[in-house]
Amino acid sequence: MKTTHRIIACLIALICFSAQRAAADSPLTSTDFHQAYADEPIVAQVEKGRTPSDETWAYLAAPDNPVAVKMAIINKIGWAFEGKNSSQLFLSYLKRKGICKTEKDLYKKRPGDLLLCAAYFKALDNYFNVEDAARMARKAKKNHPDSYTVNII
């Protein structure tokens, strides 16, 4: 009789534990690495979850600024479950400033750090479909194969 009770108890436990869904956060959305860059003035002035200012867009577009700080800015801007349009806003800024004409132009002709910014924004904009973002990030990695930041993002 004890054996039967143990088997039933084990079956009930198995059913209970297997019925729970496993869920995992993505490092894209669950790692607030921008906190490590809190002493950078440009990172400190970005409001988490808010649309960036022109000063922030300019920092992201400037080729001489460190890519790690650029990624920290984007990380702080973050994502929203219902989606965002930061990648389109970034592309619009680049177009307005004459840096690129289209996303295709950005992909083919621009430096890897700009492409990585666009890729990270695109991934955060549509967290459930990162195919384009991954393609852009791979291209950025080809342009900067030795960059730790580019490789880790």
Model regions and ranges:
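Bacterial N-terminal signal peptides
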Residues: A9-S18
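Bacterial N-terminal signal peptides that target proteins for export
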Residues: M1-A9
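Short coil/turn linking the two alpha-helices of tandem helical-hairpin repeats
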Residues: I77-S86, A119-N129
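N-terminal alpha-helical interaction modules that lie
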Residues: A23-R110
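Soluble non-cytosolic domains of exported or imported proteins
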Residues: E47, K109-D113, Y127-E131
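Residue-level recognition of tetratricopeptide repeat
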Residues: P66-A68, P111-D113, N143-N151
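Conserved binding-pocket/active-site segment within a compact domain
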Residues: F121-I153
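Mid-length scaffold segments of soluble, non-membrane domains
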Residues: Y107-K122
